[in-house]
Amino acid sequence: ELVEALQKEHEVILAMPFVGHEEDFRKMGIECIPVSMNRRGVNPFAEAKLLRDYKRLLQKISPDFVLTYSIKPNIYMGLLCSCKKIPYYANVQGLGTAFQKPVLAGFVTVLYRIAFRKVKYVFFENKENAREFGERNIVSADRQVVLPGAGINLEKYKMEPYPNHSRVHFLYLGRIMKENGIEELFYAV
């Protein structure tokens, strides 16, 4: 829905590691540029290559503005857009494991502070993350926007009554991580 809304007034180009849906975006008339990225990787050579790839991408496209999602694009594109004076916006979906290890959290905090110096707005999917970024002096409250929700469009996907069976079959698709609520899920099951 975000992409469709942006398309009404802008040319939209998506640059990301595509793991499905690339063809759906192409059918919408969107240019898709695959980007190779290891989400959890910390190899300095691979990270330098990703930064160089992003730099080339900005030179090739010359965007009017950039919207980033997830930690690496937020930080790397934030740094590059700041240097090139390209307006940019960032979306923080969650803090992830980077903020659970004190040394890594300190390093990532410094990177975010530098990357978000000139960010227009940072969108958060929950208020706790926005508060954490404020407490760490990463981004001021006047540039924070907490989204009212992210996920399933309940207008399009209406809630259905449970099947009339004695057992409910439940399928969980997601990462088994404490910070994502896996303990609460196991307790509920």
Summary of predicted features, one role per range:
Residues 20-21, 72-73, 128-130:
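Alpha-helix capping/helix-boundary segments
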Residues 161-180, 186-189:
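Conserved donor-binding/catalytic core segment of Leloir-type glycosyltransferases
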Residues 31-34, 113-159, 169-172:
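Donor nucleotide-sugar binding/catalytic pocket of nucleotide-sugar-dependent glycosyltransferases
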Residues 68-74, 92:
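Short His-centered aromatic/hydrophobic patch
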Residues 1-46, 144-146:
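N-terminal strand-loop element at the rim of the active site
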Residues 45-52, 87-89, 96-118:
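Nucleotide-sugar donor phosphate/pyrophosphate-binding loop at the beta->alpha transition
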Residues 40, 71, 152, 175-179:
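Nucleotide-sugar-dependent glycosyltransferase donor-binding/catalytic pocket residues
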